[in-house]
């Protein structure tokens, strides 16, 4: 047993698992400390991964060599590609996972990684040498030393749960809170605040009248999360089910409002705007006669179901009586009630873009303690923190992703530049370059970067090269192959698209909405031969990638030009160059605090709330630009 490591990761949630795995895979001797080894990567809320923008983050984690995508594919019990009625920039994969298998799979990966060790305990104190962290001390009194420490404590820092007027200290139901760390960090000058989140009841499926609900099956196509050449849909695929609340349900919920922690002053913290509790819905949207609910399976072999859309901290009796007003739940039996939880987080503007704290060297934060919400947002931060914790030990430039490179880059830049005043959730609307950040090409954007870092392995890099060669061959064929009207017009008319008046290149036909690579290949035998050269195991994935590039090439080029222009400002470094208080020509907002985070670049300064274009022009003039 050793007590000295390169990297220590505190907390084995989604951020901690990715951080520990990344550091270990890059060669750092890594210790992962968790309160409970049986709760590694626990899905504390819904048993699902992905969704709008979140699915893109999981694809990026996978492209960089993380594990969330692989674990999700291995444990999926339902998969859907959301937003397929829109353009591919908006397509987002989402999967229901078997909660128990998800934990088991993650634990199996971590326990078998070289360089990674696990210790079950609670960290209560950081070991410091001046303003540099050098290790941790646990509740058992054990001291571990390291060159980098990553905190990924989730909702456990001084966690306080609420069920009606009942309050329970803990980080999750039936799990203790972590104390001491927040108090120590605040004493060292790090600003801490409180946030709130919540979760719904868990239902015994044997008590549900499924014939009173609408079935929502998954999809059985080639889509998955991981770019690795692995099988998916290996577990039994299960349906979700939908129903609605009603006025009788709402009447019971309103009865409980005097005892609601959200409305009686018990909870003062801000919760996630885009995941409101059921009591918030009936108050905020009082005119709505019903709200949709989704009953989601927790696993392949369990009767436990998660009621998405019914997050609540109302008293137990109110939750039960309200649900009993819904026909499908008239005989409801639950495993545990919904509850709200308040917890400490740290203002993320106190971080550099590599997620190291500005006040304490060698200390990194990732996940919910940075004010985010969601497994995917946590995993993305954890991966970046783990990479940079390793670099901090062994040397090298910080690993930072740009806003035009990844949703993870958008996420981290938003956190450290703008801060948060509510739990931060990723949306496609937060990204300026959505067409560049599609879910189909995260490997093209990120895998080579990760390979050169030493995180993505050779097999992943070989798959990337194979995909690129096959994709580019399809595009090249389409660019060079000539089409004559007499050979194709009858087929075009059958597809419902205008016949050709004169010859053209195949690539000129493909952007038509009625045309796909597969259906045009039926009309052009030589093109069918070209498509058949694609490796069978990845054929649909690669053909889809080629089709998206062809159909949207103009939009992609235009967005890349805009991104390149903005990137020039990313290369103008200003950190430490100005005393902003002394520049009288700056706006009052800029001088009195908005620039207090001391931005790294002009581009980052331009994204700070309250900073005007004229402020940026003044700084450029002072730089002689």
State what each model feature region is.
Residues 36-38, 54, 182-320, 417-502, ...:
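An anion/pyrophosphate-binding glycine-rich loop and adjacent beta-alpha core
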Residues 127-143:
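Conserved beta-strand-loop-beta-strand element in the redox core of flavoprotein oxidoreductases
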Residues 21-125, 140, 152-169, 176, ...:
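Conserved N-terminal/central alpha/beta ligand/cofactor-binding core
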Residues 10, 143-154:
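Short hydrophobic core segments
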Residues 430, 447-617, 621-624:
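Extended, charge-enriched "interface" segments that sit outside catalytic cores
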Residues 3-5, 139-148:
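Core beta-strand elements of the Rossmann-like FAD/NAD(P) dinucleotide-binding domain
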Residues 306-372, 399-413, 539-593, 598:
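A glycine-rich dinucleotide-binding beta-alpha-beta segment and adjacent secondary-structure elements
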Residues 2-15:
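Beta1/beta-strand and adjacent pyrophosphate-binding region of the FAD-binding site
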